[in-house]
C-alpha cells in the first residue's frame, strides 16, 4: 500500500483513543484498528460521495467513523458494545459531525437495516459469512461494501475455480457480486492484535441481481460442495441427497397436479440430468457459474428444486 497522508485532526483523535482504557470483549471479536494510515486507506478505497449514507458495522472507538463523517452525508454505526457506542458518541459530541452520526446499539445480523449506499466494516470475524450474505440480500442493494476480514476468509471470497481456497462461499458470493481484494492488513495494526492476518475486500453487488432465487442456488451448491474434490455424480449418490431430491420432486408434482409414475426412479432422473450436462465426472472445485447454472436449469426442467 502506498504512503497515505493523514489529516492532523484525525491524528489527534487517534491519539486520544489510544489513551482510552477498555477491557476488550472477546465474545464481540473486538480488535480496534489503531493504525491511522490503514484507517485512512480503507476510507479512501470506499470512494464516498458527499450524498452517501454509510453503514458501519462494528465501529469500535470510531477511528474509521470520524474519517467517514468528513466525507459522507451520514454514518449509521451499528455496535453491540454499549461502552463503544458511548465512546464513539463522545468523540463527535459538540462538533459538526454529531448531527451526521446515528449510533444503533444491537446485533447487525438481527437488525432490520435502513437504506444505505456503502457499507464499511472492520468485521468481527465470527459474523463474517452472515454479514456478507445479509448485505447481498439487502434491497435496494448498496453500491459497494468495503470489509475487513480474516485473511483466509477474504481469499476464499475472491478464489476462482481451480484455486485451492475455492469453495461454496466463493461460488455463492461471486454469483451475486463482483469481489476484489484491495489491501492486506497485518495483525500489529490492531489493539489487541488478533491471532491471524487480515485483508480488506471490496464487494459490489450486481445490479440488477441475477434472475435467480438465492435459496435455489445455495441449495444446489450445498450438495455439489459436500466434498468439493469428489465428482458431482458421487455427491448426488449420497443417500440423504437422493431422499431429498425425491421428496422435492414429489412435492413439485403435487403442487403442479402431476402424477408420479409408478415406476419412477429418482436415481435414473438424477443420472439423466448429470449426463445431459456432462457433469457426472466433474468436480465442484473446478466448476464455475456456467456449469452450476446449467445444472440447476436442467434439474428445474425435470421438476427438481432445491429450496
UniProtKB/Swiss-Prot annotation:
SUPFAM superfamilies from the UniProt entry: S-adenosyl-L-methionine-dependent methyltransferases
Keywords: Methyltransferase, RNA-binding, rRNA processing, S-adenosyl-L-methionine, Transferase
Protein origin, superkingdom: Eukaryota
Positions contributing to S-adenosyl-L-methionine binding: 31, 33, 58, 79, 107, 122
The protein's name: Dimethyladenosine transferase
Function per UniProt: Specifically dimethylates two adjacent adenosines in the loop of a conserved hairpin near the 3'-end of 18S rRNA in the 40S particle.
Catalytic class of the enzyme: transferase
Protein family per UniProt: Belongs to the class I-like SAM-binding methyltransferase superfamily. rRNA adenine N(6)-methyltransferase family.
Catalysed reaction, written as an equation: adenosine(1779)/adenosine(1780) in 18S rRNA + 4 S-adenosyl-L-methionine = N(6)-dimethyladenosine(1779)/N(6)-dimethyladenosine(1780) in 18S rRNA + 4 S-adenosyl-L-homocysteine + 4 H(+)
One GO cellular component term: mitotic spindle
Amino acid at each position: 500500500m502506498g504512503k497515505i497522508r493523514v489529516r492532523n485532526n484525525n491524528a489527534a483523535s487517534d491519539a486520544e483513543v489510544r489513551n482510552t482504557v477498555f477491557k476488550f470483549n472477546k465474545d464481540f471479536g473486538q480488535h480496534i484498528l489503531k493504525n491511522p494510515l490503514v484507517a485512512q486507506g480503507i476510507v479512501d478505497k470506499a470512494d464516498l460521495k458527499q450524498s452517501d449514507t454509510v453503514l458501519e458495522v462494528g465501529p469500535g472507538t470510531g477511528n474509521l467513523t470520524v474519517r467517514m463523517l468528513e466525507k459522507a452525508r451520514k454514518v449509521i454505526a451499528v455496535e453491540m458494545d454499549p461502552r463503544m457506542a458511548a465512546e464513539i458518541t463522545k468523540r463527535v459530541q459538540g462538533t459538526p459531525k454529531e448531527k451526521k452520526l446515528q449510533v444503533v446499539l444491537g446485533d447487525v445480523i438481527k437488525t432490520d437495516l435502513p437504506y444505505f449506499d456503502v457499507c464499511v466494516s472492520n468485521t468481527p470475524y465470527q459474523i463474517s459469512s452472515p454479514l456478507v450474505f445479509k448485505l447481498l440480500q439487502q434491497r435496494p442493494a448498496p453500491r459497494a461494501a468495503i470489509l475487513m476480514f480474516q485473511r483466509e476468509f477474504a481469499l476464499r471470497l475472491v478464489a476462482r475455480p481451480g484455486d485451492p481456497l475455492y469453495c461454496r462461499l466463493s461460488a455463492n458470493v461471486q454469483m451475486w457480486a463482483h469481489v476484489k481484494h484491495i489491501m492486506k492488513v497485518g495483525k500489529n495494526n490492531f489493539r489487541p492484535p488478533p491471532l491471524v492476518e487480515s485483508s480488506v475486500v471490496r464487494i459490489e453487488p450486481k445490479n440488477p441481481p441475477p434472475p435467480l432465487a438465492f435459496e435455489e442456488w445455495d441449495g444446489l451448491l450445498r450438495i455439489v460442495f459436500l466434498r468439493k474434490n469428489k465428482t458431482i455424480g458421487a455427491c448426488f449418490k449420497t443417500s440423504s441427497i437422493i431422499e431429498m431430491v425425491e421428496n422435492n420432486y414429489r412435492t413439485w408434482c403435487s403442487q403442479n397436479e402431476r402424477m408420479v409414475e409408478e415406476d419412477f426412479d429418482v436415481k435414473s432422473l438424477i443420472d439423466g440430468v448429470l449426463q445431459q450436462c456432462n457433469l457426472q465426472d466433474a468436480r465442484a472445485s473446478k466448476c464455475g457459474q456456467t456449469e452450476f447454472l446449467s445444472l440447476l436449469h436442467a434439474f428445474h426442467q425435470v421438476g427438481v428444486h432445491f429450496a
